[in-house]
């Protein structure tokens, strides 16, 4: 007997509470989008007139070590001050590893529902691993068309012990091989505002590291749904691997949306709220969203770097001295996290929590 997806409680329990996910719904033979996933008109993504973001030609990071260092640093700074997004190549992560990463993401989500649902927040054997669907489905007007698994990093041995078997080794290698690049980018951005971060401060501001694997199943009516709604990331920097299907959109200054085109072997970097706050607004956290598609299932793998929950965050004193005013207050990052995860995606509204009164 099939699932009655017309009954919204049955649907929600099947997808979210029992951990079958959007993928389980599609695998059951679903041919139309159920009402709880239909987005309001204002949130739908009109793909037929999508712009391509020309400002994201990949930056070659291998040139940081040579005479072109200043030019590359300038490109990074300009992207951080304007779009909040840029792509990089020669970033220190092998293309072979990136391909393995995409394969392992597909392998994880191809498992039987019970193999994934064991990591639902309420029953997960480890506080480091969480599997789920959408962002905060209990509170959303419309559920996002996405399943995911989050893997929090504490140390290598705990990752290899607790992260899901199909992806633990490759996800850990991705994280570890990306961190030098991340620190180089942060140092360039700090140097540009006249700040040198001591190692202890850097570790505090980037002490939370998480690898996510996102799965966007093929959708019968992409024009009705979103993979991820409008939001900015809460942390310092996000490093993202996207596959060849595409669907990542960034909001431009003029209010229009443009797609960040997939580039084979490249990684996407975007500025998070924390860097916007530290820089007193000089750097821009990027408002972005993800569309769905009917041409195949898409995967993406972001690394999120953010402060330790116990870290105090606010505009850096050197920057406030230069600007003459602090545009954001100082706060405990745990409080920012609670606010961020306590409400549905709504553009950059989460930043209101940090604004100076």
UniProtKB/Swiss-Prot annotation:
<feature type="domain" description="Fe2OG dioxygenase">
    <location>
        <begin position="206"/>
        <end position="307"/>
    </location>
</feature>
<keyword id="KW-0408">Iron</keyword>
<keyword id="KW-0560">Oxidoreductase</keyword>
<dbReference type="GO" id="GO:0051213">
    <property type="term" value="F:dioxygenase activity"/>
</dbReference>
<keyword id="KW-0223">Dioxygenase</keyword>
<dbReference type="Pfam" id="PF14226">
    <property type="entry name" value="DIOX_N"/>
</dbReference>
<dbReference type="GO" id="GO:0016706">
    <property type="term" value="F:2-oxoglutarate-dependent dioxygenase activity"/>
</dbReference>
<comment type="function">
    <text>Involved in the pathway of sideretin biosynthesis from feruloyl CoA, a redox-active catecholic metabolite exuded by roots in response to iron deficiency in order to facilitate the uptake of iron; this pathway consists in the successive conversion from feruloyl CoA to scopoletin, from scopoletin to fraxetin and from fraxetin to sideretin. Catalyzes the biosynthesis of fraxetin via scopoletin hydroxylation.</text>
</comment>
<dbReference type="Pfam" id="PF03171">
    <property type="entry name" value="2OG-FeII_Oxy"/>
</dbReference>
<dbReference type="InterPro" id="IPR026992">
    <property type="entry name" value="DIOX_N"/>
</dbReference>
<dbReference type="InterPro" id="IPR005123">
    <property type="entry name" value="Oxoglu/Fe-dep_dioxygenase_dom"/>
</dbReference>
<dbReference type="InterPro" id="IPR027443">
    <property type="entry name" value="IPNS-like_sf"/>
</dbReference>
<comment type="similarity">
    <text>Belongs to the iron/ascorbate-dependent oxidoreductase family.</text>
</comment>
<dbReference type="InterPro" id="IPR044861">
    <property type="entry name" value="IPNS-like_FE2OG_OXY"/>
</dbReference>
<comment type="pathway">
    <text>Phenylpropanoid metabolism.</text>
</comment>
<feature type="binding site">
    <location>
        <position position="233"/>
    </location>
    <ligand>
        <name>Fe cation</name>
    </ligand>
</feature>
<feature type="binding site">
    <location>
        <position position="288"/>
    </location>
    <ligand>
        <name>Fe cation</name>
    </ligand>
</feature>
<feature type="binding site">
    <location>
        <position position="298"/>
    </location>
    <ligand>
        <name>2-oxoglutarate</name>
    </ligand>
</feature>
<feature type="binding site">
    <location>
        <position position="231"/>
    </location>
    <ligand>
        <name>Fe cation</name>
    </ligand>
</feature>
<feature type="binding site">
    <location>
        <position position="216"/>
    </location>
    <ligand>
        <name>2-oxoglutarate</name>
    </ligand>
</feature>
<keyword id="KW-0479">Metal-binding</keyword>
<feature type="binding site">
    <location>
        <position position="300"/>
    </location>
    <ligand>
        <name>2-oxoglutarate</name>
    </ligand>
</feature>
<dbReference type="GO" id="GO:0106147">
    <property type="term" value="P:fraxetin biosynthesis"/>
</dbReference>
<dbReference type="GO" id="GO:0106145">
    <property type="term" value="F:scopoletin 8-hydroxylase activity"/>
</dbReference>
<dbReference type="GO" id="GO:0046872">
    <property type="term" value="F:metal ion binding"/>
</dbReference>
<dbReference type="GO" id="GO:0010039">
    <property type="term" value="P:response to iron ion"/>
</dbReference>
<protein>
    <recommendedName>
        <fullName>Scopoletin 8-hydroxylase</fullName>
        <ecNumber>1.14.11.60</ecNumber>
    </recommendedName>
</protein>
<dbReference type="GO" id="GO:0009805">
    <property type="term" value="P:coumarin biosynthetic process"/>
</dbReference>
């Amino acid at each position: 007997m099939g699932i009655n997806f017309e009954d919204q409680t049955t649907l929600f329990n099947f997808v979210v509470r029992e951990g079958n996910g959007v993928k389980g719904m599609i695998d059951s033979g679903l041919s139309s989008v159920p009402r709880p996933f239909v987005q309001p008109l204002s949130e739908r993504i009109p793909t037929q007139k999508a712009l391509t973001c020309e400002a994201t030609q990949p930056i070659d990071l291998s040139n940081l070590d040579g005479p072109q260092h200043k030019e590359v640093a300038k490109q990074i700074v300009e992207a951080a001050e304007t779009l909040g997004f840029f792509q990089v190549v020669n970033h220190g992560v092998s293309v072979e590893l990136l391909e393995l990463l995409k394969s392992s993401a597909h392998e994880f989500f191809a498992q039987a529902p019970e193999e994934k649902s064991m990591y639902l927040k309420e029953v997960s054997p480890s506080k480091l691993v969480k599997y789920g669907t959408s962002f905060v489905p209990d509170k959303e007007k419309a559920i996002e068309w996405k399943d995911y698994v989050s893997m929090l990093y504490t140390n290598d041995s705990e990752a290899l012990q607790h992260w899901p078997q199909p992806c633990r080794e490759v996800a850990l290698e991705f994280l570890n091989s990306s961190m030098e690049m991340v620190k180089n980018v942060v140092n360039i951005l700090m140097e540009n505002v006249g700040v040198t971060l001591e190692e202890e401060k850097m570790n505090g501001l980037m002490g939370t590291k998480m690898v996510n694997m996102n799965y966007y199943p093929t959708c019968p009516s992409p024009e009705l749904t979103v993979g991820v709604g409008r939001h900015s990331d809460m942390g310092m920097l996000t490093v993202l691997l996207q596959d060849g299907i595409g669907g990542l959109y960034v909001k431009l200054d003029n209010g229009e949306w443009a797609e960040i085109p997939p580039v084979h072997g490249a990684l996407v970097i975007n500025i998070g709220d924390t860097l916007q706050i530290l820089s007193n607004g000089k750097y821009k956290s990027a408002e972005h969203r993800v569309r769905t598609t009917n041409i195949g299932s898409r995967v993406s793998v972001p690394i999120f770097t953010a402060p330790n929950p116990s870290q105090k965050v606010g505009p850096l004193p050197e920057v406030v001295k230069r600007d003459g005013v602090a545009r954001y207050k100082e706060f405990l990052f745990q409080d920012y996290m609670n606010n961020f995860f306590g409400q549905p995606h709504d553009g950059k509204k989460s930043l209101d929590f940090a604004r100076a009164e």
